[in-house]
Amino acid sequence: MTTNTHTLQIEEILELLPHRFPFLLVDRVLDFEEGRFLRAVKNVSVNESFFQGHFPGKPIFPGVLILEAMAQATGILAFKSVGKLEPGELYYFAGIDEARFKRPVVPGDQMIMEVTFEKTRRGLTRFKGVALVDGKVVCEATMMCARSREA
């Protein structure tokens, strides 16, 4: 995917996502086009606390966190495409289909998340996501998010 490069640094990401340490899983946005696609990066460090238990002696980045990183990338794309939310509104992760894990992600990897907008229907926005390491697919899924007021 090539287009005019639009990047977002961590300060801008923090303005868009409600996530914070230790659950913020997007380090930088490499490129995006509003309403179309977004490419983001997660640098995987051995210092992540979950590696103590997943798995001792054989650290593997948890698959659910790969999905969460892709979901956070969809949230950024949604915010950049729709604009600011009203006070009290959030984008919620609403569903996932066709999730597949192809290979493990380990400390030292740089994981690239590519998400593309598919459609909005009945208040749900659908995205296709893929995570790559060294150009190889590690995970792919279809994800949905919903714009909603906080309960």
Swiss-Prot record:
Q: What Pfam family is a match, any one? A: FabA
Location (main, coarse)? cytoplasm
Which gene is annotated as encoding this protein in its UniProt record?
Answer: fabZ
Q: Which organism is it from?
A: Escherichia coli O9:H4 (strain HS)
Catalytic activity, EC: 4.2.1.59
Protein name according to UniProt: 3-hydroxyacyl-[acyl-carrier-protein] dehydratase FabZ
Subcellular location field? Cytoplasm
Signal peptide span per the entry? none
Query: What family is it from?
Result: Belongs to the thioester dehydratase family. FabZ subfamily.
What does the record list as coiled-coil region(s)?
none
Record NCBIfam families: fabZ, PRK00006.1
Q: Which reaction does it catalyse?
A: a (3R)-hydroxyacyl-[ACP] = a (2E)-enoyl-[ACP] + H2O
How does the record describe its quaternary structure?
Oligomer.
What residues form the catalytic site here? H54
Quote the function comment for this protein.
Answer: Involved in unsaturated fatty acids biosynthesis. Catalyzes the dehydration of short chain beta-hydroxyacyl-ACPs and long chain saturated and unsaturated beta-hydroxyacyl-ACPs.
Cellular component terms per the entry's GO annotation: cytoplasm; membrane
